[in-house]
């Protein structure tokens, strides 16, 4: 495993990927741009190094964990409003929370932009499940929560959890046991989608096949 955390520690950050990140390209001038306020990251753009911030509950601890995907139109991440604050609130309910700083889809840093965020989300779910025993989390009580474009990523994970988008070595499933989608983007179809999110993830000239594949409201099979 690529991280070690202490039970009940709060706001421990670890890498999603150790070594080479799949589907990545070197881009010397592509740097993360963070907006910091009162010592905390309010938002960040141009993410190319995905991380997870672990917020572990200390009181009335349940057996539940949630991976949080902040929104931002696939161009930036609202880390404070749709990440850290939500994680802290979940902690008051006894729920462990893991805020995912996922990669922004960019042809500068990715070979295939459409699968980049999904790769990070799948890996994050597997990493949390790998730590389930240590953190007293039930393997069947690991969910995902997402806002806006992060809601699209959460719904993509929920409907494409078994799609092989990187070489999987973990024995753990990436399937969320439950999904909480808050004002999510659930379609990439014209007239319905959030155009900025669609353009950022799929490109302005996306094929109809790709649009349909990432219109997750139509991908539900049960």
Regions found by a protein language model. Give the residues of each.
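N-terminal cap/lid segment of alpha/beta-hydrolase-fold proteins
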Residues: 10-64, 118, 193
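Short amphipathic alpha-helix adjacent to the substrate-entry channel of hydrolases
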Residues: 56, 79-100
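Primarily recognizes the serine-hydrolase "nucleophile elbow" in alpha/beta-hydrolase
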Residues: 123-197, 211-212
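Short beta-strand element of the alpha/beta-hydrolase
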Residues: 63-71
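Catalytic nucleophile-loop/oxyanion-hole region of alpha/beta-hydrolase
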Residues: 78-79, 84-86, 102-139
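Mobile cap/lid helix-loop segments that gate and shape the active-site cleft of serine hydrolases
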Residues: 34-39, 184-219
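Bacterial Sec-dependent N-terminal signal peptides
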Residues: 1-12
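A fold-wide structural signal in alpha/beta-hydrolase
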Residues: 65, 91-98, 143, 178
């Amino acid at each position: 495993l690529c991280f070690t955390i202490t039970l009940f520690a709060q706001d421990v950050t670890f890498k999603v990927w150790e070594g080479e990140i799949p589907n990545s390209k070197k881009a010397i001038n592509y740097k993360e741009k963070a907006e910091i306020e009162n010592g905390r990251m309010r938002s960040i753009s141009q993410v190319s190094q995905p991380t997870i911030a672990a917020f572990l509950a200390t009181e009335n601890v349940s057996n539940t964990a949630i991976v949080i995907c902040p929104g931002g139109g696939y161009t930036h991440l609202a880390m404070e409003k749709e990440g850290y604050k939500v994680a802290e609130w979940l902690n008051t309910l006894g729920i462990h929370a893991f805020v995912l700083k996922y990669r922004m889809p960019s042809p500068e840093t990715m070979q295939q932009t459409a699968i980049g965020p999904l790769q990070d989300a799948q890996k994050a779910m597997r990493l949390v499940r790998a730590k389930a025993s240590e953190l007293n989390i039930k393997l069947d009580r690991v969910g995902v929560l997402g806002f806006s474009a992060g809601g699209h990523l959460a719904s993509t994970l929920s409907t494409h959890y078994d799609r092989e988008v990187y070489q999987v070595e973990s024995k753990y499933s990436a399937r969320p046991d439950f999904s909480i989608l808050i004002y999510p983007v659930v379609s990439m179809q014209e007239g319905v989608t959030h155009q900025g999110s669609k353009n950022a993830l799929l490109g302005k000239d996306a094929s109809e096949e790709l649009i349909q594949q990432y219109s997750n409201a139509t991908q539900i099979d049960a």
